[in-house]
């Protein structure tokens, strides 16, 4: 039959860590098939299932002869060390990939729960979600400097920053307020080593 309206080309956009080749191999676009017969929903499902790094994907028909794959990748906000590798965790608390090398600028999660009511009540996953919530609330400048997010209990979360600075954050509540207060404290006392925003209405700063 006519080559008109048959799939002849595939275009992929939005990939950052994944490669176009990886995405297109999993998508398995049926080149040569009639464009109208391509099951775009099945392709989207397959991509999300096989490539958990993909957060959203739109498969679109690009008339007269193309299929477009528009990918949005998950972004790591925290890393969990596991057997010498690093598990990437996104802003929704989804563990989506394991990598050998820690990506730059993503803090490491240290879960050191005291065998407390907090752990029994919230469990490791609940504590991970709190850490993710805190990481997501950090002001951009602080997030870049954050090396470790340490969770001892639900309301004992702290950050270790570059230059050995420590931030006592407290619980994940009032994150936006704490972020604003922390940014102001750091501006006012750039040489301080310890910042406490666990009670954001009464923050504290000390030299070391």
From Swiss-Prot:
Domain spans labelled POTRA: 5-74
Keyword Secreted: no
Pfam families given in the database record: FtsQ_DivIB_C, POTRA_1
Coiled-coil annotated residue ranges, if any: none
Membrane topology: Single-pass type II membrane protein
UniProt KW keywords: Cell cycle, Cell division, Cell membrane, Membrane, Transmembrane, Transmembrane helix
Residues spanning the signal sequence: none
InterPro entries hit by this protein: Cell_div_FtsQ/DivIB_C, FtsQ_DivIB, POTRA, POTRA_FtsQ_type
Disulfide bonds listed in the record: none
Location of the protein in the cell: Cell membrane
Gene Ontology biological process terms from the UniProt entry: cell division
Family to which this protein belongs: Belongs to the FtsQ/DivIB family. FtsQ subfamily.
Free-text function comment from the UniProt entry: Essential cell division protein.
Protein name per Swiss-Prot or TrEMBL: Cell division protein FtsQ
Organism field: Streptomyces griseus
């Amino acid at each position: 039959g006519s080559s008109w309206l048959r799939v002849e080309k595939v275009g992929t956009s939005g990939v950052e860590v994944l490669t176009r080749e990886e995405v297109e191999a999993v998508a398995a676009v049926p080149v040569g098939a009639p464009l109208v017969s391509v099951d775009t929903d099945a392709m989207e499902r397959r991509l999300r299932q096989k490539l958990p790094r993909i957060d959203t994907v739109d498969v679109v028909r690009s008339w007269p002869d193309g299929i477009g794959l528009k990918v949005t990748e998950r972004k790591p906000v925290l890393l969990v060390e596991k057997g010498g590798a690093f598990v990437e965790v996104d802003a929704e608390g989804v563990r989506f990939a394991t990598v050998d090398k820690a990506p730059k600028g993503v803090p490491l999660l240290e879960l050191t729960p005291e065998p407390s009511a907090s752990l029994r009540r919230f469990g490791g996953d609940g504590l991970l979600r709190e850490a993710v919530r805190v990481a997501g609330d950090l002001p951009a400048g602080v997030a870049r400097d954050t090396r470790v997010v340490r969770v001892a209990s639900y309301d004992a979360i702290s950050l270790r920053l570059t230059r050995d600075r420590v931030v006592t954050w407290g619980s994940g509540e009032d994150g936006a307020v704490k972020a604003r207060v922390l940014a102001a404290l750091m501006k006012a006392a750039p040489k301080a080593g310890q910042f406490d925003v666990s009670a954001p209405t009464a923050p504290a700063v000390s030299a070391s």
